[in-house]
Every structure is written in C-alpha cells, then in structure tokens.
C-alpha cells in the first residue's frame, strides 16, 4: 500500500514525512519505506488512534515518541518537546502524524522556520496544503513565532 494512501500524507523532505493517523498496515508501510522514527502528536483517543501504537512501532523496529497535543489547547511545552525530539532525530527518517495532519502541519511549519530557514510565508503555505487553521491555532502559531523571534 503506498504511503500516499495515508490520510493527508505529505513528503516534506527526503527525511521527513507527515500524515494523519495510519492504520496498522500503513504503519508497516512506513517502516518498509525506510522511516526510523515515528512521532505521534495525537491524543490516545480510541476514535483516532491504534490500540497500542507504541508496541506496534517497536515490533517494526521503529523508535516511537508520543507527544499528546490537545487540538483545542496546544501548548508551548508541546512544541518544545517536539523540537527536542526532531533535533535528536536529525540524522534519521522521521514520520510525524496526528489524527488528520493538522497539529503536525503546524508544528512542522514552525520547526521548518526555526531549523530549515523557512519564511513564515513558507510555513503558512505548508500548513495550508492540509488545512486552514482555526483561531486557536492562528494564535498558537503567532505566539510561537514571537517566542522564536525573541529567542525564547
């Protein structure tokens, strides 16, 4: 099964892919495609997640990180944890997902601005490939950009 069958799959670079929640079969495809690390920003809600994604990832030889981000209340600490995980996996192929790639596209855009030299316009374009952020996320992104500019 091709990776582009995963909900909202996006190839960001040769080392970074993002998407919504993969199925068990799609997680096997992620491993078969050569990804080393899975980062899940979704909540452990049975409506949107696998029964035990950490165990499934481990059984496939994937390093697994779970950073539960509340879609209605994303926190600066969540973003810092994400940056730390991404920085630690710099030399690996990373697959980042949440339920629909909304949280992920926003976090990856901010990471791209901080680490890849993307402009805010490039970050916004990346996000809008997937969705139009609601007011909560517009505010979160703006606050994160202000903190980054201030060096916090």
What label would you give each PLM region?
Residues 98:
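Short cysteine clusters
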Residues 1-95, 106-152:
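Cys-dependent protein tyrosine phosphatase-like superfamily
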Residues 101:
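Substrate/cofactor-recognition hotspot
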């Amino acid at each position: 099964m091709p990776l582009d069958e995963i909900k909202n799959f996006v190839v960001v670079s040769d080392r970074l892919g993002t998407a919504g929640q993969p199925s068990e079969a799609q997680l096997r495809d992620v491993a078969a495609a050569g990804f080393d690390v899975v980062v899940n920003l979704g909540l452990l809600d049975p409506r949107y997640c696998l029964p035990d994604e950490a165990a499934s990832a481990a059984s496939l030889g994937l390093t697994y990180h779970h950073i539960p981000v509340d879609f209605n209340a994303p926190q600066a600490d969540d973003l810092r944890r994400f940056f730390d995980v991404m920085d630690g996996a710099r030399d690996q192929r990373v697959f980042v997902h949440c339920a629909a790639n909304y949280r992920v596209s926003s976090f990856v855009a901010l990471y791209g601005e901080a680490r890849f030299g993307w402009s805010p316009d490039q970050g916004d374009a990346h996000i809008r490939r997937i969705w139009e952020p609601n007011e909560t996320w517009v505010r979160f992104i703006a606050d994160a950009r202000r903190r980054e500019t201030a060096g916090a």
